[in-house]
């Protein structure tokens, strides 16, 4: 068997509306995902046992034990196929860890697709998406990519028409935020509030249909931003820098701490990136475009 390499994008929540906590501990969500051109590569190789190795961004923060989502994905797929999960997974990370960009979910999606090919299963994409939902809320979208509406825990996906491409700048933090901590802080901040059923705004869907960056920038929204900034007040300074240098929109990505800025074009994205780098409010900066395709097999 030859090695199989899969490239998987990061995700950005253009809008994230969080409902009340459910009995199972999750929250009902309404979100619009967009896949962006920050990628992890997952390579599956033949092996006698199931093992994983990691290189690149934030290696020391990535678990190498059974909690690694790529290993979880391998076991879910092997159980579905009725085989022993024998393979080595090598992950090359460029998506920051614990950054609100679903890097772990991307690795799980990459493992699913790479092992599907390595083990010669060639399951329908719909079956892989169903398996992905067993692993984590963001894993199905990492497979699908582009732009999509997510309901339930975020795993129930419907494609969204998005014309054109959008230019993004991401400001990363040296210290991550744990997603459960951010949700717990949101619950604390909203304690006693009556929450409506979550739904995305008509304004966001309209901005995507027409492909206008200025319209999209004005309707970016994230219910978790309040909680993330409460836990990390320094994020407010990062968001302010982007606003001051003309970003069309500024938002905490998912549960944070990464901040995302929408630019008018590539030139303005460079200006915003330079300003953020000079400000000292973040550890590093990257530019990306979206939407892009989901997990796909590439030449190693």
Predicted segments, located by residue:
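ATP-binding N-lobe of GHMP and related small-molecule kinases
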Residues: 1-99, 117, 121-126, 163, ...
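Residue-level signal for inorganic ion chemistry
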Residues: 14, 42-44, 70, 104, ...
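Short, conserved aromatic-histidine micro-motifs
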Residues: 60, 126-144, 272-290
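Glycine/serine-rich anion-binding loops at beta->alpha junctions
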Residues: 63, 90-119, 137, 247-263
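Contiguous, small/hydrophobic- and glycine-enriched helical/loop subdomains that border
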Residues: 86, 108, 112-149, 153-156
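Conserved, helical-rich catalytic subdomain that frames metal- and/or nucleotide-binding sites
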Residues: 144, 151-249, 264-270, 274-277, ...
């Amino acid at each position: 068997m030859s090695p199989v390499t899969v490239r998987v994008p990061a995700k950005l929540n253009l809008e994230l509306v969080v409902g009340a906590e459910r009995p199972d501990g999750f929250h009902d969500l309404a979100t619009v995902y967009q896949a962006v051109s920050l990628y992890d590569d997952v390579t599956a190789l033949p092996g006698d046992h199931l093992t994983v190795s990691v290189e690149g961004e934030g290696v020391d923060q990535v678990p190498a034990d059974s909690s690694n989502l790529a290993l979880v994905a391998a076991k879910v797929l092997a159980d579905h196929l009725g085989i022993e999960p024998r393979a080595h997974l090598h992950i090359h990370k460029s998506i920051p860890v614990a950054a609100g960009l679903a890097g772990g979910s991307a690795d799980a999606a990459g493992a699913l697709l790479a092992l599907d090919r390595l083990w010669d299963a060639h399951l329908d994409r719909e079956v892989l998406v169903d398996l992905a939902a067993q692993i984590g809320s963001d894993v199905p979208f990492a497979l699908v990519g582009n732009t999509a509406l997510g309901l339930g825990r975020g795993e129930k996906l419907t494609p969204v028409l998005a014309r054109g491409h959008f230019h993004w700048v991401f400001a990363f933090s040296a210290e991550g935020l744990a997603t459960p901590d951010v949700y717990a802080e949101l619950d604390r901040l909203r304690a006693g509030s009556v929450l409506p059923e979550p739904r995305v705004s008509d304004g966001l869907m309209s901005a995507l249909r027409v492909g206008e960056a200025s319209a999209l920038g004005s309707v970016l929204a994230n219910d978790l931003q309040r909680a993330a900034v409460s836990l990390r007040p320094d994020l407010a300074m990062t968001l302010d820098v982007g606003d001051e240098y003309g970003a069309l929109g500024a938002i905490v990505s998912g549960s944070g701490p990464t901040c995302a800025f929408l630019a008018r074009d590539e030139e303005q994205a460079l200006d915003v990136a330079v300003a953020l780098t000079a400000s000292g409010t973040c550890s590093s900066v990257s530019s990306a475009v979206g939407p892009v395709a989901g997990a796909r097999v590439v030449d190693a």
